[in-house]
Swiss-Prot record:
Homodimer. Interacts with the dynein subunit dli-1 via its N-terminus. May interact with microtubules. It holds the Pfam family HOOK_N. This is Zygote defective protein 12. Residues 43-169 form the Calponin-homology (CH) domain. Residues 1-20 have a biased composition (Polar residues). The lineage of its organism: Eukaryota, Metazoa, Ecdysozoa, Nematoda, Chromadorea. Belongs to the hook family. GO terms for cellular component: centrosome; cytoplasm; microtubule; nuclear membrane. GO terms for molecular function: dynein light intermediate chain binding; microtubule binding.
Length: 764
């Protein structure tokens, strides 16, 4: 078990020597690294203290990690378990539980708050700190084992010692006695030694109840009492410190005077006893003494002793009267001291609240300065945005100029010249083909005329042939008829016809027929070359017909090409006019986007104006809080200067304290309202930032190549098919789109950075 009277604690002077390494010559903590041996010893001490604290089960935080202990939250929860009335829930809420261990500023602030509260508790316990072990303990943290382990060990020593000297010390003494003594005996002995060291460094302050006898000037004590209680001036905290130091000085002087009076009383009592014994012995020896000189000497000595005894008795009576008088004064001063201690406790609580409010005011002041710098930065960036808008206008005008000059003048002219050269070439080819066609047509017409003539001749020959055939048939019929008639009649007819002889008359038809047949044969023989020529003409006519068909097809192809070229020319002209219209539409859309960005800028300016208005309100409230803080400090100084019992000067100091508490509560509510308004503003700014970011990303996506093709299709133009469309798509539009995209991306980046800086949380 833990024994505070252990003999091992006698070596506290030697055991305390290792702690001198963590302080400099003035006793102020430094971050000088310890040796490995000293560091291991401090780690062992911390482990023993952690074992004792872990049995309390006052916290769920890890106690075996010195980094977590240096946050201060675990020690605060253990102190809350030790004395719930002093280390209350409200104070415990001011010690945040950190999720990260790398923020040294917050850790140092937590340790300073923790030690201030522990110092107040030590004063409440009527003790004082005479060691420099905990001086500026928060500033000794450097995030290293060589600095953090000694700090954690010193705080653990103080926390465990407060458990043994606090109001609930019986509970923890009983707890220490119930711990197993066998396996942890050395650990408990080490804890007892450390607690003994701390108790020597936190001695009790002597009170007036310890004063038994007082001697000296009553006026000096009364004047000291009057000087400590009456208001001498209104200089605030400086007078308060001088008054407290004067009270301590009076107490020390009174204690010294009491010790002197005690020693003087003891000496006088010893002298009285010695003289009494000498008197008794002298009376016994009177009978034996015969010399008158010796008797006279003894009588003189006896008389002197009686006088001294009488003086001593009178002195004792005076001292008893003074003691009774001073006992009444001591009782009165004790009551005043109790009242002052209670008032000091309330003042300490009020100081804590005021320190918290002052730190909050400093944080708000830092935030206000940051917002003011952000507002100035926003104004500068607003000027930059205006300059960029002017550049956008100039770029837009240059874009229109380049689109009109480069796209219409160069591309359209080059395409039209090329098309005209193609049309000229095709027209020349068409003229040549038309000339050839005309010559071929004339040849065909001549051949057709010759063919018609030959056909007429053939028709005439065929008619002649038919006539000859009909005549031959008629002659044959006649010949047959003549053969069928009588010879007389035939003879007569032949005689009548030519007065020929009978024999000649029979030969004449045959000769005629023979002659006719010969002529017919000659005619037929003369028709044979004509038939060959007819066949030849027919073959030539067929060839010419085929050439005519080929030429006709070529003419149709040329006409189709001319029509296609004319159609392409018409489409190019339509595309040129349509692209100009499309560019105008895109410019209108760009203007709409610029207007939208202007509206966004106006909204941002409105938000900025709101933030500036909020900053102005925060500044006004900050000034009001500072004014209230100054008033509270003045009231505190006045109350501390009036540290006297209630009703002594017909005023109620408790009522003033209540008023200050009420005012402090109002200030805390104002701070909470300001925090709520700040959180609301931050959320609205974050929402606006997200909306602007999403709108900017949507605009960037809308300006992609796919969306441009969709916009082109919606505008009524087809995909690029001509040289002009290809040149426009590859030259005119991409660089304009690139400039617009870069401008939008820059503005989005600007707004994102601006709102991120505005919404950044304040650094501790």
């Amino acid at each position: 078990m833990l024994d505070l009277t252990n003999q091992e604690s006698d070596s506290s002077e030697n055991g305390n020597s290792k702690y001198a390494d963590s302080t400099d010559g003035r006793g102020i903590g430094t971050s000088r690294r310890l040796d490995d041996e000293d560091l291991d010893e401090r780690r062992k001490d911390l482990a023993d203290l952690v074992f004792w604290m872990s049995g309390l089960k006052a916290t769920t935080l890890p106690l075996d990690d010195h980094t977590s202990l240096c946050n201060g939250r675990a020690f605060a929860e253990i102190l809350h378990e030790i004395d719930r009335s002093f280390f209350d829930e409200r104070w415990l809420e001011t010690m945040p539980e950190m999720r990260t261990s790398s923020n040294l500023v917050v850790k140092r602030s937590n340790l300073r708050k923790l030690w201030r509260k522990m110092s107040d508790y030590i004063q409440v316990l009527n003790r004082k700190v005479v060691s420099t072990r905990w001086t500026e303990i928060g500033d000794r943290l450097d995030g290293l084992d060589e600095t953090d382990i000694p700090v954690a060990a010193d705080l653990a020593m103080a926390v465990v010692s407060l458990a043994f000297i606090g109001k609930t010390q019986e509970k923890y003494i009983q707890y220490s006695q119930e711990l197993p003594a066998g396996e942890h005996q050395h650990m408990m002995a080490n804890v007892a030694r450390l607690v003994q060291i701390v108790m020597e460094e936190l001695p009790e302050v002597p009170t007036f109840h310890e004063i038994s006898e007082l001697d000296g000037s009553q006026n000096e004590l009364n004047s000291s009492h009057v000087e400590s209680s009456v208001i001498t001036n209104g200089n605030g905290s400086a007078e308060r410190r001088s008054t407290l130091s004067a009270n301590d000085q009076v107490l020390v002087e009174a204690q010294l005077e009491i010790d002197e009076l005690r020693s003087e009383r003891d000496n006088l009592i010893k002298d009285v006893e010695r003289l009494t014994k000498a008197l008794e012995s002298s009376q016994l020896d009177t009978s034996t003494c015969s010399e008158p000189n010796e008797l006279s000497i003894l009588e003189k000595q006896n008389e002197e002793l009686r006088v001294k005894r009488r003086q001593a008795e009178e002195r004792v009576l005076e001292l008893e009267a003074s003691m009774e008088h001073f006992q009444a004064i001591v009782v009165k001063l004790t009551d005043e001291n109790d009242t002052l201690q209670s008032g000091q406790k309330e003042l300490n609580m009020l100081k804590t609240h005021l320190d918290t409010a002052q730190s909050d005011v400093e944080e708000w002041r830092t935030i206000a300065n940051k917002y003011q710098s952000d507002a100035e930065m926003l104004k500068k960036r607003e000027k930059e945005v205006k300059e960029l808008q002017g550049q956008v206008k100039s770029l837009t005008s240059r874009l229109e100029h380049h689109v009109k000059t480069a796209t219409i003048d160069e591309d359209n002219k080059a395409g039209i010249v090329q098309l005209r050269s193609q049309i000229g070439t095709l027209t020349a080819n068409n003229v040549e083909l038309n000339v050839g066609l005309e010559s071929k047509k004339r040849i065909v017409e001549q051949l057709e005329l010759q063919l018609i003539q030959y056909k007429e001749k053939v028709k005439e020959l065929e008619d002649r042939k038919e006539d000859l055939i009909a005549e031959r048939n008629e002659l044959e019929n006649k010949l047959l008829f003549k053969e069928s008639v009588t010879p007389r009649s035939l003879h007569e007819s032949m005689f009548e016809a030519g007065h020929l002889s009978f024999d000649d008359k029979t030969k004449l038809p045959l000769e005629i027929e023979n002659k006719r047949l010969t002529e017919r044969i000659q005619e037929l023989e003369s028709l044979e070359p004509l038939k060959g020529e007819i066949i030849k003409m027919k073959s030539q006519n067929g060839v010419l017909e085929e050439e005519k068909l080929v030429i006709t097809k070529q003419m149709e192809e040329l006409e189709r090409q001319v029509a296609d070229l004319q159609e392409k020319l018409t489409k190019n002209q339509q595309h040129a006019s349509g692209d100009v219209v499309e560019l105008k539409v895109q410019l209108e859309k760009a203007n709409v986007e610029v207007e939208r960005m202007r509206e966004t800028e106006m909204r941002t300016e409105a938000k900025l104006a709101g933030v500036e208005e909020l900053l102005r309100k925060r500044n006004v409230e900050k000034e009001a809080n500072e004014t209230a803080l100054q008033k509270a400090k003045a009231v505190i100084d006045e109350l501390e200067s009036r540290n006297r019992p209630v009703g002594e000067d017909n005023k109620t100091s408790v009522q003033d304290f209540k008023e200050l508490k009420t005012e402090n509560e109002l200030l805390r509510q104002k701070n909470e309202a300001l925090e709520t308004a700040l959180n609301t503003t931050t959320q609205s700014l974050e929402q606006e930032n997200r909306l602007i970011t999403s709108a900017a990303h949507q605009q960037i996506l809308d300006r992609s190549s796919d969306s441009m093709m969709i916009m082109r299709a919606q505008a009524g133009s087809d995909h690029p098919q001509t040289l002009l469309d290809t040149q426009k798509m590859t030259r005119a539009l991409p660089w304009r789109f690139g400039i617009s995209s870069m401008l939008i991306i820059f503005m989005v980046w600007f707004f994102i950075n601006t709102f991120c800086e505005v919404n950044a949380p304040p650094k501790a």
